[in-house]
Amino acid sequence: MSDIITLAIESSCDETAASVLKNGREVLSNIISTQIETHKKFGGVVPEVASRKHVENIDIVVQEALDKANIGFNDIDHIAVTYGPGLVGALLVGLSYAKALAYTLNIPLVGVNHIEGHLSANYIEHKDLKPPFITLIVSGGHTHLVEVKDYGKYEILGKTRDDASGEAFDKISRAMNLGYPGGPIIDNLAKNGNKHAIEFPRAYLEEDSYDFSFSGLKSSVLNYLNGKRMKNEEIVVEDVAASFQEAVVEVLSTKALKAVKDKGYNIITLSGGVASNSGLRAKITELAKDNGITVKYPPLILCTDNAAMIGCAGYYNFINGKTHDMSLNAVPNLKINQ
């Protein structure tokens, strides 16, 4: 069987990315143009600005991915592209480019769910990994606990009922005037703080639920900060960061490992931007070790948005006959099992 070459495109939020893969798991190139510096002054991603930046960057990024992989357009077997969830304008830039290219080259177009892309990042790093297993997907827009039954076959066990975990990090960072994105900033501060200094609440919800909730925790931290400011008392940002982070990662880890044990698996994977959080990696690894469970996660470059993960997911869709025609449209609220 000859090698299958995938060109993948990702533009769901504020990264313009393109990647070339061989047989789904071998990354030949992975180019990412980030807009963090552009959006930092706004304290978050501005959708219109993000879309314009994608338009400026996408052709350059795709060409660089092809050049680095040392392949031409005629070597590509199919194109994988994110079509949701995400910012609709941003999604349309990547999707329109991919559709035009697939049409011109007369090769298959494969639409990829961004969340499915995140969990697929682990296939790239861990060559021996295959379904079934449990995965925890945690990012600025998503917090999902998913049973991966097979390639492309999933059951959502739990998800956030309000804020995503990464969204909570950004909001607390903004409340302390620390900057954007909040996740890495709080993670770094937490390393020098006392995680037991402030007892913030943990929301475990119903006993049999795998769902998450971070709005109560967020409100508790905001109330703590406001109370300190009203009394003109010192706020030790390192302790706030460490205590807040501990409250988040404790719930994420506990629920994830409960799902692994309840379902009878011995492997859990992490993915998404928050999977790069050192506190989460340490906590879930510690709890997993005590229960004989193996934890796998991608390198940092594959945790945040990238096209390699989209290409991996797209490859498995492609070999399973899941392709799309030119009517494929952006779906900003796409669910993982749609």
UniProtKB/Swiss-Prot annotation:
<dbReference type="InterPro" id="IPR017861">
    <property type="entry name" value="KAE1/TsaD"/>
</dbReference>
<dbReference type="GO" id="GO:0061711">
    <property type="term" value="F:N(6)-L-threonylcarbamoyladenine synthase activity"/>
</dbReference>
<dbReference type="InterPro" id="IPR022450">
    <property type="entry name" value="TsaD"/>
</dbReference>
<feature type="binding site">
    <location>
        <position position="305"/>
    </location>
    <ligand>
        <name>Fe cation</name>
    </ligand>
</feature>
<comment type="function">
    <text>Required for the formation of a threonylcarbamoyl group on adenosine at position 37 (t(6)A37) in tRNAs that read codons beginning with adenine. Is involved in the transfer of the threonylcarbamoyl moiety of threonylcarbamoyl-AMP (TC-AMP) to the N6 group of A37, together with TsaE and TsaB. TsaD likely plays a direct catalytic role in this reaction.</text>
</comment>
<dbReference type="Pfam" id="PF00814">
    <property type="entry name" value="TsaD"/>
</dbReference>
<dbReference type="GO" id="GO:0005506">
    <property type="term" value="F:iron ion binding"/>
</dbReference>
<feature type="binding site">
    <location>
        <position position="277"/>
    </location>
    <ligand>
        <name>substrate</name>
    </ligand>
</feature>
<dbReference type="InterPro" id="IPR017860">
    <property type="entry name" value="Peptidase_M22_CS"/>
</dbReference>
<feature type="binding site">
    <location>
        <position position="114"/>
    </location>
    <ligand>
        <name>Fe cation</name>
    </ligand>
</feature>
<feature type="binding site">
    <location>
        <position position="118"/>
    </location>
    <ligand>
        <name>Fe cation</name>
    </ligand>
</feature>
<protein>
    <recommendedName>
        <fullName>tRNA N6-adenosine threonylcarbamoyltransferase</fullName>
        <ecNumber>2.3.1.234</ecNumber>
    </recommendedName>
</protein>
<dbReference type="GO" id="GO:0002949">
    <property type="term" value="P:tRNA threonylcarbamoyladenosine modification"/>
</dbReference>
<feature type="binding site">
    <location>
        <begin position="137"/>
        <end position="141"/>
    </location>
    <ligand>
        <name>substrate</name>
    </ligand>
</feature>
<keyword id="KW-0963">Cytoplasm</keyword>
<dbReference type="InterPro" id="IPR000905">
    <property type="entry name" value="Gcp-like_dom"/>
</dbReference>
<keyword id="KW-0819">tRNA processing</keyword>
<keyword id="KW-0479">Metal-binding</keyword>
<dbReference type="GO" id="GO:0005737">
    <property type="term" value="C:cytoplasm"/>
</dbReference>
<keyword id="KW-0012">Acyltransferase</keyword>
<keyword id="KW-0408">Iron</keyword>
<comment type="similarity">
    <text>Belongs to the KAE1 / TsaD family.</text>
</comment>
<dbReference type="InterPro" id="IPR043129">
    <property type="entry name" value="ATPase_NBD"/>
</dbReference>
<feature type="binding site">
    <location>
        <position position="183"/>
    </location>
    <ligand>
        <name>substrate</name>
    </ligand>
</feature>
<keyword id="KW-0808">Transferase</keyword>
<feature type="binding site">
    <location>
        <position position="187"/>
    </location>
    <ligand>
        <name>substrate</name>
    </ligand>
</feature>
<feature type="binding site">
    <location>
        <position position="170"/>
    </location>
    <ligand>
        <name>substrate</name>
    </ligand>
</feature>
